[in-house]
Amino acid sequence: HEGLAAAGRDREEVTIDLFVTMSVGDDEAAAIADIRAWATSQAATFHPWKRMPPAWERFRPEFARAADAYHLVDHLSLQARHRRIVSDDFARSVALAGDLDTCVDRLRRLWQLDIDRITFALLSGGRQQRLAHLSGTVIPAVEAAGRN
């Protein structure tokens, strides 16, 4: 809220929309593989940062490798060579991946932050199926868990 105060604005004047990339599946390794190309694209953009959040300092070598290997033409390609550049730990730090319970728990914790809404980025491959699963299973599970 420091930026709001410095600008003389109230929190109610700003909409905070958290964009979430997520892969839900019973096979955790497959879910992580599903988010890896997107995570690599993020790592490539972090490479030039001079100041890094302390929790991400350990990923600097991955950011450098991603910057060298990432090609926009293969941005979310499931076959992109750059998808293997980043570690599982980094991929999990920028996206949600795992079974339904894991993703629902993380979404509920994110919703507790001072945000107004969550927008879900749809990954490549089977987007209609992903959207149907999100709207028919994931969101209702988050809503049901919120009532408990």
Predicted features and spans:
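An alpha-helical appendage that flanks or caps ligand/catalytic pockets
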Residues: 1-109, 143-147
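Short secondary-structure boundary segments
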Residues: 122
